[in-house]
Amino acid sequence: MSRDYNCTTDDQLAWGIPSISHAWGLWALLGVVTVLLLISLAALLSQWTRGRRRNQEGQGPLSGRSAEEVPLYGNLHYLQTGRLSQEPRSEEQDPPSSGGLARGAEEAMCYTSLQLRPAQGRIPSSGNPIKYCEVVLDSEPKPQAPGPEPELYASVCAQTRRGRASFPDQAYANSQPAPS
């Protein structure tokens, strides 16, 4: 049983690999792909070495920092009251009155700082320092929700609703849905 080949053994470099003169298009395509692969590899190595240089200078990306060093940002109303605000209230509908601590807790909103802590051994930037404030809690007892309380690793500052806009339609950092 002999096989009939269209090509002679002189037309092939090895079994299944045609010579350059018979399959020049395939060899050209292989050459282009190889050159593009080498260019991509050179660009990747260049970016990697620049990234390492920046990391050594303390200016690198945030991926190497712990969660405690990267502040969160958002409306932290849930941490004060234990429930998410469902409907926005405007100032015309709800004029300020002497509602006591419960009223103050509902009016106060918390926001975190967007500034990173300076790297150890470096001089802090001239930006605004993180302000620490007390959070006012309402005097009503909170219903115990099943499960642990959410943890938040950020410093916060209480602000009134007039000072910052609230975002009632969005979920925020470490917020949990209100119990039904």
Curated annotation (Swiss-Prot):
Q: Which residues carry this modification: Phosphotyrosine?
A: 73, 111, 132, 153, 172
Q: Where is this region: Interaction with CSK?
A: 153-156
List Phosphoserine occurrences by residue.
63, 66, 85, 90, 166
Q: Does this entry carry the keyword Transmembrane?
A: yes
Q: Which domain of life is it from?
A: Eukaryota
Which residues are exposed on the Cytoplasmic face of the membrane?
Answer: 46-180
Q: Kindly state a single biological-process term from the GO annotations of this entry.
A: signal transduction
Q: What is its main location?
A: membrane
State which residues carry a glycan (glycosylated): 6
Q: TM spans, by residue?
A: 25-45
Q: Which UniProt keywords apply?
A: Adaptive immunity, Cell membrane, Disulfide bond, Glycoprotein, Immunity, Membrane, Phosphoprotein, Signal-anchor, Transmembrane, Transmembrane helix
Record region (Interaction with PTPN11): 130-135
Q: Which InterPro entries match?
A: Sit1
Q: Which residues lie on this side of the membrane: Extracellular?
A: 1-24
Subcellular compartments: Cell membrane
Question: Can you supply one Gene Ontology CC term for this chain's record?
Answer: plasma membrane
Share what the entry says about its subunit structure, partners included: Homodimer; disulfide-linked. When phosphorylated, interacts with PTPN11/SHP2, GRB2 and CSK.
Q: What is this protein's function per UniProt? A: Negatively regulates T-cell antigen receptor (TCR)-mediated signaling. Involved in positive selection of T-cells.
User: What is the name of the protein in this document?
Assistant: Signaling threshold-regulating transmembrane adapter 1
Please give the organism: Mus musculus
